[in-house]
C-alpha cells in the first residue's frame, strides 16, 4: 500500500484536476450560449433568403433553370467536406466524424468513384495528412472562430464552388455532427452540390438554448417562430431574368447552408466537451472519495501499528 504522503499528494492532485475540468465545463457552457446568440443573429438573413428563393421558385420551374449549381451530371468524382474541431477533450466528437468520413470514403471507393477531401478542423487535417498515401486532400481550413462566422463559411464555400463549377468534382457531400442534445450528437452525411433541382426543401427549424436544472446544464429546443408574410408581392416584376437571379442567390444560399452546418457542428463540439468535462469532474469526485477512504484506512492501520508497538514494548 502506498504511504500516507503519496496518497495525500494524489488526493490534492485529483482535487486540483477536478477544479480544472469544472472550469472547462463552465467555459464550454458559456460558449454554447454564444453559439445560440450567433444562430439567432444570422437567422433573419437566412430566413429571408430562403423565402425569396421560394417566391422565385413559385414563378418558374427549377428544372428549366439554366444554373450550373442545379445541374446533376454523371458522377465520377466526389468531394467529401469533413468538419471537425481544432482541439480535443470533447469525448468522441472528432473521432466519430473521422470514422464516418473513412466509412463514406470506403463506400464511394468501392463504387469506383474518384474521391478527394476538403477538411475543416485541425483534428481531421492531422489525421488524414498522416495518411496522405491513402487519401487525397484538396484543401484544408483550420483556426476557425469558435463560433463560426459567415467569413469562415465563405472560404470553404468558395473552394467547393470552384471545384464544382470547373467540373473538378461532380458532387460535394458534407460530413458534420448534427446537434441533437447534450448527450446525443450524431455525424451525418448531406449533399451540398448539386442543389436539389426540385427546389428548396424547407426543413423544420429549431432554436436551442442552454438552461440549468438542479445545478446541471441542459439543452432545450423550441420550434423557430413561423413568419408566413410574403416576401415579395405577386405583381413584382424582376428586371433580371430568373436565371440571373438564381445564379446570384444560389451561392449565397449554399454559403448559408454551410454556415448553419458549421454552427451546428460547433454547438455539438461544445456540448460534447461539456459532457466530457462533466464526466471527468464526476470521476474525479469519486476518485477523491476512494482515495480519502484509502488514506483513512492507511492512517488507521499506521496508528494501530504504533499502538501495538508501544504496548509490546511496555510488556517487555
Curated annotation (Swiss-Prot):
GO terms for cellular component: plasma membrane-derived thylakoid membrane; proton-transporting ATP synthase complex. GO terms for molecular function: ATP binding; proton-transporting ATP synthase activity, rotational mechanism. It comes from the Bacteria. It is found in: Cellular thylakoid membrane. It holds the Pfam family ATP-synt. It is a peripheral membrane protein. Belongs to the ATPase gamma chain family. F-type ATPases have 2 components, CF(1) - the catalytic core - and CF(0) - the membrane proton channel. CF(1) has five subunits: alpha(3), beta(3), gamma(1), delta(1), epsilon(1). CF(0) has three main subunits: a, b and c. Produces ATP from ADP in the presence of a proton gradient across the membrane. The gamma chain is believed to be important in regulating ATPase activity and the flow of protons through the CF(0) complex. This is ATP synthase gamma chain.
